[in-house]
């Protein structure tokens, strides 16, 4: 048995076309959706992510603004810039690219973003709203994974789901969204005693720890859906995920590749969240 591939590029293309239509409709009414992206320092990976986000905006009819600062930028100056963007009616979404330099408190920075412009969904108000089942914004990566389940008619109600990873960006919100969809959810992490005992019972496994080959074929229930959120490099320097793809694809029912799986969906859902923010602002 070879797993069906969940193609993030193809789904992303469809959803981006829908986002572009919504952006065009808003622009025609004088409310072009706008996203501001702030980059502090010269982290090469962050620079690539920011470039991809700005390009996605340009390709789909969004207004975008990129603020790039040296890593000597003070926390006070960054907070002042966020305050300006909070008050700018052309900007509907504000994204601060993480990680930030050590002298800047990322929690303080995220909390400074107006919740209605927090398109990453990381603000404590949005995290709390997600917990109570009424999210204003769903964090982009878990939201993208949910769209993948939906597109492939993968049943979530009553399913046993294991999320490997407990980060605020992926693991925790992923678990909340699965819970909201009616799955029975287990969160595993670095302190979990017997990871395989949990994953072998799972209909759905989401791997999001940033550790190569944390999930191997012998740990997967036949026919399970395996979502790989990891982003690592193998010994040859080639991009790979958290899952041993070559082995697991012969056991799983559905699987996402790396690259070309969850990655493209993250930026797509950022566009969708920005559109939703712009639509709310237009009707306010």
Curated annotation (Swiss-Prot):
GO terms for molecular function: methenyltetrahydrofolate cyclohydrolase activity; methylenetetrahydrofolate dehydrogenase (NADP+) activity. Keywords: Amino-acid biosynthesis, Histidine biosynthesis, Hydrolase, Methionine biosynthesis, Multifunctional enzyme, NADP, One-carbon metabolism, Oxidoreductase, Purine biosynthesis. GO terms for cellular component: cytosol. GO terms for biological process: L-histidine biosynthetic process; methionine biosynthetic process; purine nucleotide biosynthetic process; tetrahydrofolate interconversion. InterPro entries: Aminoacid_DH-like_N_sf (IPR046346), NAD(P)-bd_dom_sf (IPR036291), THF_DH/CycHdrlase (IPR000672), THF_DH/CycHdrlase_cat_dom (IPR020630), THF_DH/CycHdrlase_CS (IPR020867), THF_DH/CycHdrlase_NAD-bd_dom (IPR020631). It comes from the Bacteria. It catalyses: (6R)-5,10-methylene-5,6,7,8-tetrahydrofolate + NADP(+) = (6R)-5,10-methenyltetrahydrofolate + NADPH; (6R)-5,10-methenyltetrahydrofolate + H2O = (6R)-10-formyltetrahydrofolate + H(+). Disulfide bonds: none annotated. Catalyzes the oxidation of 5,10-methylenetetrahydrofolate to 5,10-methenyltetrahydrofolate and then the hydrolysis of 5,10-methenyltetrahydrofolate to 10-formyltetrahydrofolate. PANTHER family: C-1-TETRAHYDROFOLATE SYNTHASE, CYTOPLASMIC (PTHR48099:SF5), C-1-TETRAHYDROFOLATE SYNTHASE, CYTOPLASMIC-RELATED (PTHR48099). Homodimer. This is Bifunctional protein FolD. It comes from Burkholderia vietnamiensis (strain G4 / LMG 22486). The gene is folD.
């Amino acid at each position: 048995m070879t797993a069906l591939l969940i193609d993030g590029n193809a789904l992303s293309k469809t959803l981006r076309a829908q986002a572009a239509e919504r952006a065009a409709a808003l622009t025609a009414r004088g409310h072009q959706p706008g996203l501001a992206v702030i980059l502090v320092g010269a982290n090469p990976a962050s620079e690539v992510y920011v470039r991809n986000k700005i390009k996605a905006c340009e390709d789909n009819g969004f207004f975008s603004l990129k603020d790039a600062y040296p890593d000597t930028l003070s926390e006070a100056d960054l907070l002042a810039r966020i305050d300006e963007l909070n008050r700018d009616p052309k900007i509907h979404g504000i994204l601060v690219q993480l990680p930030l330099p050590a002298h800047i408190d990322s929690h303080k920075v995220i909390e400074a973003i107006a919740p209605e412009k927090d398109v990453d969904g990381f603000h404590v108000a949005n995290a709390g709203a997600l917990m109570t089942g009424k999210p204003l914004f769903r964090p982009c990566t878990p939201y993208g994974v949910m769209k993948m389940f939906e597109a492939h008619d993968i049943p979530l109600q009553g399913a046993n789901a294991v999320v490997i990873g407990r980060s605020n960006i992926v693991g925790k919100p992923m678990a909340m969204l699965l819970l909201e969809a009616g799955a029975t959810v287990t969160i595993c992490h670095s302190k979990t005693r017997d990871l395989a005992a949990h994953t072998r019972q799972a209909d759905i496994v989401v791997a999001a720890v940033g550790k190569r080959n944390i999930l191997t074929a012998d740990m997967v229930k036949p026919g399970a859906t395996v979502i790989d959120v990891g982003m690592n490099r193998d010994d040859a320097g080639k991009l790979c995920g958290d899952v041993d793809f070559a082995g697991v694809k012969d056991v799983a029912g559905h699987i996402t590749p790396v690259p070309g799986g969850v990655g493209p969906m993250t930026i797509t859902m950022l566009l969708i969240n920005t559109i939703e923010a712009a639509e709310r602002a237009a009707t306010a």
